[in-house]
Amino acid sequence: MSYGRYLADYSLYSYCESWCYLFEGTPKLAAIETTSKPSKADTASRRYAYMTSKDGVLYSSYLDGLYFYPYAKKDKSFTVPYETLYVFINDCFYLEELRINATPSHYFDFNILPSNTHLKKVIAEGGKPFETRYWTDGDVLFSRQESTTANPKAVSVAYYPQTKNDKAYRLPDIPEGYYYNIINQFNLNTYIEELYVPARASVWSGMTEKSYRPPNLRAIHLQEGNPMSQSTIDAFTRHGVSIDYNY
């Protein structure tokens, strides 16, 4: 299957991320349509097992799960329906802007392949820094993780566009009581050379490995008090990334 439309039967069952693999090798696929409808009894007992399509995009039957966004769908901007709670966005050839609902009352679980080469921005509509689960700062998407005993106020970089062409990026300052969880969302960006990291942030030690760090990264500037260990500093230095405290 390399082009055209795919007629998905409602009886197929899968989790959303597996759809990415099902449709691999279909770069010309521009829309998905579903055919037969399940009974109300079926959808009540297995609501995530049945699918429907809307504007060429594949969802679970209640639209609460976005399963697959066609590679060749030509819209440059796409707004995730309000009722959609679980989203998986695979690599797309035309999509440049994704809009999600980030109002405080709206639960939302977001997953996007970092290899997406065209998506320039994810706009969290209604999002407020450190108050809602998602918010946008410039063209970078942030996420406040669910509170737990271990991570009461953890914040993450949820999406850093591969297309963002700034040579340096400074993580925004963070309020007292919050902290950035492991920073590791920059590895496929070929522009970034310098990363500025505040004290309340953990840089993932795995970024010392070539495949997990930006290919042109040459310096990480830490704020005084950052908890990066000496062994991690030494590992970065051995791989050509200088570490200093000039945040």
Where on the chain are the PLM-derived regions?
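Solvent-exposed loop and capping/linker segments of extracellular ligand-binding repeat ectodomains
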Residues: 1-247
